[in-house]
Every structure is written in C-alpha cells, then in structure tokens.
Amino acid sequence: MKKLLAAILVLTLAALACVTPFAEPASQTNVGTVVAQTMQALTAVASPAPVATSAPPSGTSDLLPHPLYYLNNDSAGFLQVHRLEMDGKTVQQITFEPGNVETYDVSPVDGSVAYTSNNQLLLVEVDGSDRLLLVDGGPLASDESYATSRVGNVAWSPDGKTIAFGYGGLNFYALDTGAINKVLENQVDTTPGIAVLREGYSPKEYAPDGSKLLINIGYYEGGVYALYYLSGNTLIRSGENAVTCCEGSWTPDGSAYYAASPYLGMISPGLWRINADGKVDTLLDGEFPGPLEFAQAPILGPDGQLYFFHYSLPKAEDIANRTPLYMVRSETDGVTGRTNLYPEPFENINEILWAPDASFAILAIAPLENIFQGGKAEIYYTDGSPSMPLVPFAQEMRWGP
C-alpha cells in the first residue's frame, strides 16, 4: 500500500502542470542545465531498440518535415525558444529574454513566435528579430493577480491572423488591428478573504479549420477541457466523463479531439475522444480497481489508424513511479487491432511530438525518473527504422510551418 501511495503522489505531481494552468508557474531556471549535466554523468539512458544512427533515412534530403521549435536554456540558464532546422542539425536561438519563456506558440503561416515572459505577451519574427510587446500584465503581487492579471497559454489560429491567450480570461489578439477581445472572464471569489479561482479560461489548441478552440477551464485545483466556437461565441462544456488533460490532437477534419493521460492521482489515466458537440467517449478507462489503462499523445494518422503510447496495468498495486509506455497503433477506438510498434516499452517519457503523418514520434526522455520536464529529444519511427538523436534537451516541442 505504501508503494502504491508513493507512486500515486509522484504521478500526481507530474500531472499538476497540465491541470492547474492558472497557478504561479514553477521556476524552471536551469532545468535544461541540470538535465544536461545529469546526462553527461550517465553512461546510458534506457531506451528501446533499435539503436540510433547518424544519417537521415535514405532518399530524403531533410530529416524533419518542418522546423522543430522547443525550449532550452540559454547561456544564462533561462528557458528560451530555439529552432532546429529540417536538416536535424542547425539550431538557432529565437528569443532572448532576461527571464524564462513560460508559454509559446508558432505561427503556422510564417513561423513567427508568440510567447509569454515576465507576464508579457510578446511577438518575434521567424529569425527572432523585431521583438514586439503586445500585452503587459504588470507585476503579479497577490493571489488575486494570478487569476486576474497573469498572461499565459498562447495558441495561434491556423490562418495566422489571431493569437488566443489567457489574461484574466480567454482573449483574442487581432494582429492586423492590435485589438484585444476578451470573450470569457475568469471567475474569482474573494469572499473567503483570499482569492479563490472558481473558474478560469485559457486556450489549448485551435481546430484545423479554425472554427473552434479547445480550452482549459481551470479551478483552484484541477480543471477540464471544453470547446469554444468562434462563430456565435459559444462555450460547449464537456458533460459526463469530462476530460481533465493531457496531451492530444485534433482529427484532421476537426470533428473530434483525442486526449490521453499517463498520470494517476488527481486525474485518472485513460484515452478519450471529445466530439464536436462536447460529448466525451471513453475509449480506455483508467479507473480503480483496474486494469489501469495509461495512454499518451494520441494522433489520427492519414491511414485512418490511431497512433499513441499505451500501457495496461492489471492491478493498481503494481504501479511504479513512472509507468513505461509502448508505441502502439490501433483502430480509432484505441482497442481493435492494437499492435505494439516496438517490442519494448519506453521509460521516463516526458513529452511526445508526432510527425504530422504519424511516420515517427519525437520523444523527450528524461535521464532519471524524478525529472518531469523535457529531456533528450530523439526520433522513433513507426516502421522500425533506426532511431535518430536530435538535441540533448528539448521541452514544449512544436512544429513550425
């Protein structure tokens, strides 16, 4: 029982970042440095076969389908946005802030970057030039200010014309006019003598056609996903089986959002499909007493198959601090025809970014199980081709155009 409680506590702490988007962000200074130093001290990091090689697959001129954006430390130890070019070798630092970049997103049109740092929303061109201050939230001096004045969670519209961001609620910044439209106001209760966030709103990800936005509805502890339709300014809440987090993706036609959780604690593991009407289909259940179905990073491939990472734990008592995950492929229900694409599970996965065509996934793998942010970024192919190392550390990975 003690082992089970300890494991649940570790997984709960790992999940807090995705379910409490309005709390004061934890300091991330030197995260990359710590990881890099730890990796240098290790002789090997556990990862499944096949082993890495040093050349792109034959017949291709570039290793990556698009430039890869990610966070890594600068020389001063602050997290900044970097870009790895399609050759898989050339790295350029994009932001140069005197503090950590906390959240960011990349324009799908021209590769420019919108990001938050020092409670400001900023914009730079694809090469890091022409830094522009869009919103200044000012100092955060009280509990209430974090719910009413914190600038965070950025999402760029597919047409590149609008930036959705959190700032006392859900806001839209029009790049052509500079106008800001707040469509949902955070609900803060100060009657207990302290500020308690009853309900707060921030963007997660636009649907491919730009008609709707997956948003976080955050509470004092925890939160859920919901859909916001731009036409009609309509908020669609998830009803029964509301999804709380974590990594996921829209279907190409925007009819549904697949979400998955590899965590256990304040939230449950599982795999869900959020339909356009807000109805949630539970595909894999992670409720007690088990089996517990852990899942992460689902994506619907162009072949109509669902690709994700998965592990089924028969009994809750068998849980470890970090659950290993297999790369799998299945029908859209997450169950039918489910096949492991690698013979061994992956350990200590902190982040997964799929190629748009699901031909490979970039994994950020931590060198130790108690590191929960970022890691060594490496490509693992769904067809069993040799894996490819990219950069020593990456966090919050995004594709550029």
Predicted regions and their residues:
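Sec-dependent bacterial lipoprotein signal peptides
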Residues: 1-16
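Sequence signature of WD/YWTD-type beta-propeller architectures
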Residues: 18-401
